[in-house]
């Protein structure tokens, strides 16, 4: 049974091409994926991300629970509304999901987890939470809209209750606040995103989502679909769960070493495997690659290295760069001489640092200059 977000009819009325995405009927584009991509890089676009799962955790021991559940350290979260990106691991160090955790109060934290992993995540979190007496509450009453781009914040702030505009303007990156729109809609406003641009991800009651979406349209925010979301996030060097990492891949093998907090001696699920890989080195590595020849890099293509074979993970044609870019997982070792097998032809690749694009501009070295 395909699920629909509260905005489904709204997307169709706007001419969206709808596709199945992890069991959800979602817009891939509203006419031109390319235009939507550039709209976000240059001004502001909005995405329906109501398929994402919001999970509220309540209890006196919720911080202690999250110190055990997550590979990054919630002890970094000391101010209400502050957020942290982290992986949730299995005992083998594999990534069950990547998520954002928000500190609300000492007995209330909020998680935003991926749509495709919802059932698995809820079961795992529930199993681990039981001995900490933490109550796990899925918030299916919420919708979620991401407004992204250099003009995004101004356009959203114009819709807020005037009493809250100053606080919203000062909100730092990876922080959130509870606010209201001019029309009295309760909004959880987070300065986060999945595009590499500034902006907000807004959690709000389902029954208010259509009205707020239409208010954003009136502000000149253009709708954007999952197609543009994918090219934007890959340019920004952001992983997609299920494609760039999964239960059989550790954060060290997924370019996510920066999300691991080993230094404080905290015991968390998967720690022993990560300690071993940090000391001995992980057997595989995730790298960014650019193909200067014409063509497109696709998931599953074989990558040839001096140390053995790897594969393309996320791959796309980058609208900002005008070249094919990708993540690849390859054996540990040299990444000097790289080639990709495209229908039997070996095509050279360049390994580059990611993000490929920051603030709408190619990062140094990405274009080969």
From Swiss-Prot:
It catalyses: N(6)-[(R)-S(8)-aminomethyldihydrolipoyl]-L-lysyl-[protein] + (6S)-5,6,7,8-tetrahydrofolate = N(6)-[(R)-dihydrolipoyl]-L-lysyl-[protein] + (6R)-5,10-methylene-5,6,7,8-tetrahydrofolate + NH4(+). Keywords: Aminotransferase, Transferase. GO terms for biological process: glycine decarboxylation via glycine cleavage system. It comes from the Bacteria. Its EC number is 2.1.2.10. It is an enzyme of class 2 (transferase). InterPro entries: GCS_T (IPR006223), GCS_T_bac (IPR022903), GCST_C (IPR013977), GCV_T_N (IPR006222), GcvT/YgfZ/DmdA (IPR028896), GcvT/YgfZ_C (IPR029043), TrmE/GcvT_dom1 (IPR027266). NCBIfam families: gcvT (TIGR00528), PRK00389.1 (NF001567). Belongs to the GcvT family. The glycine cleavage system is composed of four proteins: P, T, L and H. The glycine cleavage system catalyzes the degradation of glycine. This is Aminomethyltransferase. It comes from Xanthomonas euvesicatoria pv. vesicatoria (strain 85-10) (Xanthomonas campestris pv. vesicatoria).
